[in-house]
Amino acid sequence: MTLSAAQRISCDVVETRAEVARIFNIQRYSLNDGRGIRTVVFFKGCPHRCPWCANPESISPKIETVRRESKCLHCTPCLWDVDECPSGAFEPIGRDVTLEELVNEVMKDDVFFRYSGGGVTLSGGEVLLQAPFATQFLQRLRRFGVHTAIETAGDAPLSRLMPLARQCDEVLFDLKIMDADLAQSIVAMNLPRVLDNFRQLVADGINVIPRVPLIPGYTLNETNMARVLAFLLPSGIRQLHLLPFHQYGEPKYRLLGQEWGMRQAIPPTEDEVSAMRQLAEREGFNVTVGG
């Protein structure tokens, strides 16, 4: 999906609604977004345009309405009204929650956190668009002893990122296209700022876990991986997560009535993933596929 400059959102714009967040999903019992059993809160809105995005419903900060054809009775005339639809075919994507509501919602899973050593992960979208709320939210959870994490691309002013990161036990930090010009033109990302923010978090003693999506045609190549490793080596970090491309997001594009440019892309083979893994392991990295 291509958006005009006027339609795009930016993490440089300060979000002032620290008491309300816009989310689109709460996923329970996750094993892939940090340690233990986790509850993942997906925040709505993203400033980037990754062609491989598996959550296209996360991109717009607005609450969207979709129609599930399997439920549609094909009434005439159709009002496209969530409240009036007799079959429930229309559903909103996105809702606003207060700090208290969200704390109460995720703390229903506290027994699983304590049993497994898990906790809460904030994902998106890009959580940095709603950093003031997210920071307060994680502060509250830490008072209950909940393990906290965020998933982020790190492309925001450090003044927004650092206060949130300091409330995290883990920061799952994506490193994508490692060429500054390509990162800007393909995904609308300020790579120099991303890399500087990564260094600043590490220098502050924050537990940063770098993650690399392995995307055919974009990041699934030795050149990009070599740049990732060259960047990470001076930091002392030796943990790395590799995230192979998948097609799980394709039905979401259809639901939104959008064409997905990666629909014909083939997920990496085991040999291709293994080759990237071996590159990192030869440099002394402890590699996890998935995570």
Give the location of each predicted region.
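Pocket-edge positions in alpha/beta enzyme catalytic cores
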Residues: 64, 94, 126, 186, ...
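N-terminal [4Fe-4S]-dependent radical SAM core
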Residues: 1-74, 86-94, 108, 112-114
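Active-site anion-handling motifs in enzyme catalytic cores
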Residues: 97
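Conserved residues at beta->alpha junctions
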Residues: 44-45, 76, 124, 152, ...
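Auxiliary Fe-S-binding modules of radical SAM enzymes
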Residues: 1-35, 214-291
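Conserved AdoMet/S-adenosylmethionine-binding subsite of the radical SAM
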Residues: 100-103, 107-255
